């Protein structure tokens, strides 16, 4: 049931050729006869190699790359006893290494060879399932600590030795999280780490001391590179640091005190859940710092009482797991799917969180040690214990076999014949520990893919049963639809006359019935011709009566019906979304309420059904994050993603934007947010995403080219200025982003630390191009934002990124008046504090430069008239809120003119970039009256509020000419006063 024999034989012949080439004195042509003789005898080294290469392409690759290792395996099959003493053996190899290049190669060669040995042991069943993931974890720990210790010595030579205020030498302590912490690592797991050190202080023994945090941050960066960087020898481990305090925005290394303060004051329940697995790697039990670190973390993880307060958080986590299974259709994912590894881990960790404070036996990291303890406490039955144990070991066997094939982090069942055969062969018989930790043979009735899948599903069903019973949900809102007039809506024999009767009963007027019946009949016809499966049809049959009952109970049923039917048609073949609406009545009600009031929301949900998930929590829906919470929410959203999957990362950014936009729109529609706050939220959302996009672009560009040599530490030397509505903190639902990219002045120089060296100027152009590419990339979730760069110096003819000096020179000497008007509505939206201050000084200097007031009036007036002529030709009976005279554009021009006219006398008048505060400051300084300022602000917010409302309805910003007549009249008076008197 593995690779066809001729293919294996050909692979062995190629390996034999390799041996003869590298070791002609030890191997000759007789080796080919040995292949013929022993290929079918798994007890011989050649037969064992046959089995190993048939099960793993990764093993084949390592044997080809490492001839000495191949020679060893040809003479003697690796055994589990050979997969031991990792730290000691690695230490010997690292002892003579003097350069980082040597460190990188040694780590990777050691890792690959030892992983290949474990894969061989796994393929030959010479190690149990448990022994494999324990050894994988021990190997990872040895590599991490070996690299840390080597780099620590080098760092001390470079920057001095870190000490505390009493002169005690400080070391970097590393918490291994997740499967690494629980001695449960997979073949191709990434590793989750947290760096910490005992106390603040500074280095000694260096001409230029640095503080401990800087030392350990630099050391941590070097360690991550040593483990994570991909070289010609591969990588050691994909390294994820996002579980540290404050995530990506937090310091890379924190002192013990800072760690304790964070977890006591800000630690969240999901961080408690994650920290259960946290284990100090390479811990010396005689080290007092090890004891201190454990003591400061324990109260955060384990409460001294039975912690029922966490149950709601666990319910939320459980709901998220269930929704993700539904939403993503994770049928063949053995980790994340229903009844998968994650659910077993969740079951165990629930009991640890709730009872671990009182039950010391639950304060462990290893799942297999915890299961019997949970049974002893009568928290699960003996049968449930066995069901979970056997399922876990079977699933972990499948997972490790899958990942050992190509050294890739996957939990998806294969679709190709070869890899299915490998799984069948690996799972019909293998070894695991008995109750006394002795190997025992496990056999399953697996002989083809169907029987494998049947065994897998049996395990998953047992896990799901325990998972579902663990934290119950009382669905008190479950509706009884037996009396629902729409119960038979999808029955083929329901006639139009009967539908008309139902509509009449529900108050639909006679003149509207034909139109509505036509829509309903078209929907029924569409459904009858769609292939949606048995389960899909069952769910739809239950859902439609509930949906129609609520639609026709709403006064806006005529508008609502086509919107809701469109959504249902879009999700018709995706049963998971139909189930979500059926099983969550509140979500259905919420969706109907929002779609009745917003075409935009209805369109977004129809295009991106993943947004339905946001409807499950009304409280969260009506309360968008506070402005400072946006980065943390986005980080939390991205945590579940593999760090090296850029496409998935970019798609997730778009999904986060859509989900948050939905929350803002919902709060707007339902009156929870005033118009000014809506724009604030939309602006801060855009800025949060912009920060993430720039950082992602920076990572991608620096991974290839390194970074400009003039930069220090974590500097980027790069600033993004927001113009227009972004600059004015006035974004709307459909606004694009007007951006200008600026960089440090670079007289010469190039990049360092990358695979390819380029000129520093070219680096920033590449960075700008990458940012634009990420924003505009079309994925299944749409694009992120439309980006407009035409306001940069020289417009479309200018470079995508220019220096601050070039920007200032252009604005001072070449910019037109309209470009200075645009500068009024600009502000720094990304960049280091020093660069933001620099931009603001340049901006203020330009806006406060002396200018001819008469010419300024002429320029502003002519530009407005030119714009009006360009947009003329519309219906005279309509008022375009944005473009027509007396509208938004006039108010914006008034604000810009006031700044340009009066900032030369008082530069403080140029401080604000938003119209409302510009009018406030002008009134404060007597430029306009308080009454004029209030009226201008009221006109502006009223017009913007109407535009927001029309956006939500999916309509253009056009109303009848009678609307806003007073506002238009007042704006015209101000315009005449400023530009014609």
UniProtKB/Swiss-Prot annotation:
Positions of the UniProt region annotated as Adenylyl transferase: 479-981
Keywords carried by this UniProt record: ATP-binding, Magnesium, Multifunctional enzyme, Nucleotide-binding, Nucleotidyltransferase, Transferase
SUPFAM superfamilies: Nucleotidyltransferase (SSF81301), Nucleotidyltransferase substrate binding subunit/domain (SSF81593)
A GO term for molecular function: [glutamate-ammonia-ligase] adenylyltransferase activity
Cellular component, GO, one term: cytosol
TM helices/strands, residue ranges: none
EC number: 2.7.7.89, 2.7.7.42
Domain of life, per lineage: Bacteria
Required cofactor names: Mg(2+)
Enzyme class, first EC level, given as a word: transferase
Reaction catalyzed: [glutamine synthetase]-O(4)-(5'-adenylyl)-L-tyrosine + phosphate = [glutamine synthetase]-L-tyrosine + ADP; [glutamine synthetase]-L-tyrosine + ATP = [glutamine synthetase]-O(4)-(5'-adenylyl)-L-tyrosine + diphosphate
Region (Adenylyl removase) location: 1-473
GO biological process: regulation of glutamine family amino acid metabolic process
Family per similarity comment: Belongs to the GlnE family.
Entry protein name: Bifunctional glutamine synthetase adenylyltransferase/adenylyl-removing enzyme
Organism in which the protein naturally occurs: Mannheimia succiniciproducens (strain KCTC 0769BP / MBEL55E)
Gene giving rise to this polypeptide: glnE
């Amino acid at each position: 049931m593995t690779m066809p024999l001729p293919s294996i034989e050909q692979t062995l012949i190629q390996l034999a050729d390799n041996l003869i080439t590298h070791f002609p004195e030890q191997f000759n042509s007789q080796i080919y006869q040995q292949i013929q003789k022993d290929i079918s005898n798994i007890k011989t080294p050649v037969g064992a190699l046959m089995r190993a290469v048939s099960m793993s392409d990764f093993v084949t690759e390592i044997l080809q790359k490492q001839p000495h290792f191949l020679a060893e395996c040809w003479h003697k099959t690796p055994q589990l006893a050979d997969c031991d003493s990792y730290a000691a053996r690695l230490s010997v190899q690292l002892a003579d290494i003097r350069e980082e290049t040597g460190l990188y190669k040694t780590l990777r060669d050691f890792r690959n060879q030892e992983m290949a040995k474990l894969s061989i042991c796994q393929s030959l069943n010479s190690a149990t399932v448990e022994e494999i993931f324990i050894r994988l974890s021990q190997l990872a720990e040895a590599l991490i600590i070996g690299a840390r210790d080597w780099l620590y010595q080098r760092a001390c030579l470079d920057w001095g030795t870190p000490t505390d205020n009493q002169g005690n030498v400080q070391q970097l302590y590393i918490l291994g999280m997740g499967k690494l912490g629980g001695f449960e690592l997979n073949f191709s797991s990434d590793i989750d780490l947290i760096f910490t050190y005992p106390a603040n202080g500074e280095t000694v023994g260096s001409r230029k001391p640095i503080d401990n945090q800087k030392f350990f941050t630099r050391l941590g960066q070097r360690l991550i590179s040593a483990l994570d960087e991909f070289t010609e020898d591969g990588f050691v481990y994909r390294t994820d640091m996002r579980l540290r305090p404050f995530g990506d925005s937090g310091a890379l290394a924190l002192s013990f005190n800072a760690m304790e303060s964070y977890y006591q004051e800000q630690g969240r329940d999901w961080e408690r859940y994650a920290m259960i697995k946290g284990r100090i790697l390479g811990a010396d039990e005689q080290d007092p710092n090890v004891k201190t670190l454990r003591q400061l973390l324990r109260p955060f993880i384990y409460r001294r009482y039975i912690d029922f307060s966490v149950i709601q958080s666990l319910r939320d986590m459980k709901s998220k797991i269930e929704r993700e299974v539904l939403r993503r259709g994770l049928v063949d994912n053995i980790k994340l799917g229903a009844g998968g590894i994650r659910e077993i881990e969740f079951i165990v960790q629930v009991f640890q969180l709730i009872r671990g404070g009182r039950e010391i036996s639950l304060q462990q990291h290893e799942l297999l040690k915890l299961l019997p303890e949970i049974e002893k406490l009568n928290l699960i039955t003996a049968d449930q214990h066995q069901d979970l144990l056997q399922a876990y070991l079977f699933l972990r066997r499948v997972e490790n076999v899958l990942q050992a094939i190509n050294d890739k982090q996957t939990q998806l069942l294969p679709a190709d014949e070869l890899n299915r055969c490998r799984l069948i062969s690996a799972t019909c018989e293998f070894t695991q520990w008995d109750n006394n930790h002795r190997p025992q043979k496990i056999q399953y009735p697996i002989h083809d893919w169907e029987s494998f899948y049947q065994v897998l599903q049996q395990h998953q069903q047992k896990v799901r049963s325990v998972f579902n019973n663990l934290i119950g949900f009382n669905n008190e809102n479950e509706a009884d639809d037996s009396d629902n007039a729409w119960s038979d809506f999808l029955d083929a024999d329901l006639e139009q006359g009967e539908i008309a009767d139902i509509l009449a009963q529900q108050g639909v007027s006679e003149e509207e019935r034909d139109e509505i019946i036509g829509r309903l009949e078209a929907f029924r016809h569409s459904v009858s011709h769609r292939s949606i499966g048995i389960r899909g049809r069952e769910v739809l049959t239950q859902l439609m009566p509930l949906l129609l009952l609520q639609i026709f109970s709403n006064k806006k049923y005529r508008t609502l019906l086509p919107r809701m039917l469109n959504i249902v048609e879009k999700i018709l073949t995706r049963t998971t979304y139909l189930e979500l609406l059926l099983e969550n009545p509140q979500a259905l009600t919420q969706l109907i309420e929002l779609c009745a009031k917003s075409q935009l929301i209805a369109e977004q949900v129809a295009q991106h059904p993943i947004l339905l998930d946001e409807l499950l929590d009304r409280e969260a829906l009506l309360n968008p994050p506070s402005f400072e919470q946006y980065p943390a929410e986005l980080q939390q959203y991205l945590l579940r993603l593999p760090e090296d999957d850029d496409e998935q990362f970019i798609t997730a950014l778009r999904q986060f934007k859509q989900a948050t936009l939905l929350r803002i729109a919902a709060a707007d529609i339902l009156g929870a947010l005033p118009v000014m706050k809506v724009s604030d939220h939309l602006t801060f959302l855009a800025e949060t995403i912009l920060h993430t996009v720039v950082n992602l672009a920076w990572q991608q560009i620096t991974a290839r080219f390194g970074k400009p040599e003039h930069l220090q530490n974590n500097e980027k030397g790069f600033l993004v200025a927001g113009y227009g509505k972004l600059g004015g903190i006035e974004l709307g639902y459909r606004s694009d982003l007007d951006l200008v990219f600026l960089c440090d002045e670079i007289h010469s120089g190039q990049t360092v630390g990358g695979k390819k060296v380029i000129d520093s100027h070219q680096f920033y152009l590449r960075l700008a191009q990458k940012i634009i590419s990420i924003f505009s990339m079309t994925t299944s979730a749409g694009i992120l934002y439309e980006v407009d760069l035409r306001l940069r110096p020289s417009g479309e003819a200018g470079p995508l990124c220019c220096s601050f000096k070039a920007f200032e020179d252009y604005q001072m000497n070449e910019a037109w008046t309209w470009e200075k008007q645009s500068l009024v509505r600009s502000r720094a939206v990304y960049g280091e504090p020093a660069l933001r201050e620099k931009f603001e000084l340049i901006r203020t200097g330009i806006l406060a430069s002396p200018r001819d007031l008469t010419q300024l009036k002429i320029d502003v007036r002519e530009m407005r008239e030119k714009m009006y002529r360009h947009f003329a030709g519309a219906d005279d009976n309509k008022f375009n809120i944005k473009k027509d005279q007396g509208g938004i554009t006039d108010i914006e021009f008034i604000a810009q003119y006031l700044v340009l006219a009066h900032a030369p006398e008082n530069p403080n008048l140029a401080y604000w970039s938003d119209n409302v505060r510009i009018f406030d400051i002008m009134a404060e300084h007597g430029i306009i009256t308080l009454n004029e300022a209030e009226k201008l602000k009221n006109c502006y917010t009223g017009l913007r509020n109407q535009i927001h409302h029309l956006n939500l309805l999916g309509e253009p910003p056009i109303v009848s000419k009678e609307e806003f007549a007073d506002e238009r009249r007042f704006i015209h008076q101000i315009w005449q006063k400023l530009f014609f008197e």
